[in-house]
């Protein structure tokens, strides 16, 4: 029996179990997947080739009481914010560790911004420091990304606080859409790659909490409170689709189906996580269209696992679209309409 057949059988069996046992069973599988996919050792060096004009900035954050490291490549007044995954490190952003993103966007007319850190943060403003791992300050990533960093970059690097793109993967896929939903002038463009797009639904709060606890011992209740707290829906892209439609935000949503291609990612955790995530992405697409959304690209190919080569492929694919939206460049040849 294949791993996916075992998972399907487990999910079917879980429907007959008491809720607590069912959550524990599925949670164990999800945490296994997250550990396998994101649990690698710290990387000593980043991918950027020598010669690129990449700067390592220290941007003050009054809300978090510390300076935040930001990797920055200047390229124009409008920027692409590249947000990291669940196991974000404190040395380099995962986009730089795992992809040639700086090189791919060099001389594109766009600046590239990679905030560093934020493990298990969901790039949101938390209620309090994590109560399970001794964190001595409160994550305030939304405040940093929408107020503190834009003001500093405008004053010091000439980057506009408006007209930018937010691109996130996995943990931060939904974060990118939420930033655009609430800050439409700053982010007229948002992309989610293999994101968790309905975090307030069903088992997702519990599963997310288990994953966060595994990734650094973080407590989801310290982030958004119990699952009944309004913060879960406030930060749920599915719930906030009407905002994205009303804003006419340009969105790019990608998710594979768990089948590897020649790009790699042929391992059980990466395949399982992508298959688990696909359903909410498809539901997001359908709900967006039903709510009148007509400014989205939805890519659900017959392959793709929860791994960096697929996300980088999408980052390259969306470059012309981002340039068109942010800089008014020639639009890509293929029309971008909600997929059927």
From Swiss-Prot:
Record's keyword annotation contains Secreted: yes
Activity regulation text: Inhibited by 6-azido-6-deoxy-alpha,alpha-trehalose (ADT).
Region forming the signal peptide: 1-45
Record: residues binding substrate: 86-87, 170, 198, 276-279, 283, 306-308
GO molecular function ontology, one term from the record: diacylglycerol O-acyltransferase activity
Record carries keyword Transferase: yes
UniProt keyword list: Acyltransferase, Secreted, Signal, Transferase
GO cellular component terms attached to this protein's record: extracellular region; membrane; peptidoglycan-based cell wall
Residue numbers spanned by region Fibronectin-binding: 102-112
Sequence similarity: Belongs to the mycobacterial A85 antigen family.
Subunit organization: Homodimer.
Name of the protein in question: Diacylglycerol acyltransferase/mycolyltransferase Ag85C
